[in-house]
Amino acid sequence: MSKQLIYSGKAKDIYTTEDENLIISTYKDQATAFNGVKKEQIAGKGVLNNQISSFIFEKLNAAGVATHFVEKLSDTEQLNKKVKIIPLEVVLRNYTAGSFSKRFGVDEGIALETPIVEFYYKNDDLDDPFINDEHVKFLQIAGDQQIAYLKEETRRINELLKVWFAEIGLKLIDFKLEFGFDKDGKIILADEFSPDNCRLWDADGNHMDKDVFRRGLGELTDVYEIVWEKLQGLK
């Protein structure tokens, strides 16, 4: 399958395929935090992220969620549907943590009575600012119906993920999703789902996600390996 690099990101490289509607996503060993300010090469990270994300996307597909995932090609590669990415990071919070706690001056780990969905404008130059629905419309990123769909679909995905992670003894604190338009103009889930873009805490409150790297709490791959081993228990 011939391929040409079309995009190089912080965590993945994207390649063309012989089918104009398909791409190959190659997961890197690079770990970044604080919008790329903190950066490090960590051997084995790409393999673990690809394994975890492929597994989660397969389960989401089986549950009826429309995603870009087609199949896992190798340890670090997966085949995806080509999408036009919507320049929004859609964040859902089940508990207070991270920037939410800092922004509102509250402790981490407080359960939210109703999960909160937030939008962040995907723009590295602006440091991905927190925006609301009206900003999304002003920037002509999405209209009312599309905004409602993004929120509804994110909440539906959350209900699935919460159950799966609870089954393996992990609490889903929050996560970030990205969506895109497929060749037919339908909004589908894209990007990845791994400990890179979610927060997971075990029963003792230990971080099982990229906060280990952000906050210097231990070895990233050790934690990701534990998450991957636990997930395989869902099969």
From Swiss-Prot:
Belongs to the SAICAR synthetase family. The keyword ATP-binding applies. Pathway: Purine metabolism; IMP biosynthesis via de novo pathway; 5-amino-1-(5-phospho-D-ribosyl)imidazole-4-carboxamide from 5-amino-1-(5-phospho-D-ribosyl)imidazole-4-carboxylate: step 1/2. It is an enzyme of class 6 (ligase). The keyword Cell division does not apply. The lineage of its organism: Bacteria, Bacillati, Bacillota, Bacilli, Lactobacillales. It catalyses: 5-amino-1-(5-phospho-D-ribosyl)imidazole-4-carboxylate + L-aspartate + ATP = (2S)-2-[5-amino-1-(5-phospho-beta-D-ribosyl)imidazole-4-carboxamido]succinate + ADP + phosphate + 2 H(+). GO terms for molecular function: ATP binding; phosphoribosylaminoimidazolesuccinocarboxamide synthase activity. It comes from the Bacteria. Its EC number is 6.3.2.6. InterPro entries: SAICAR_synt/ADE2_N, SAICAR_synt_PurC, SAICAR_synth, SAICAR_synthetase, SAICAR_synthetase_CS. This is Phosphoribosylaminoimidazole-succinocarboxamide synthase. Disulfide bonds: none annotated. CDD domains: SAICAR_synt_PurC. Keywords: ATP-binding, Ligase, Nucleotide-binding, Purine biosynthesis.
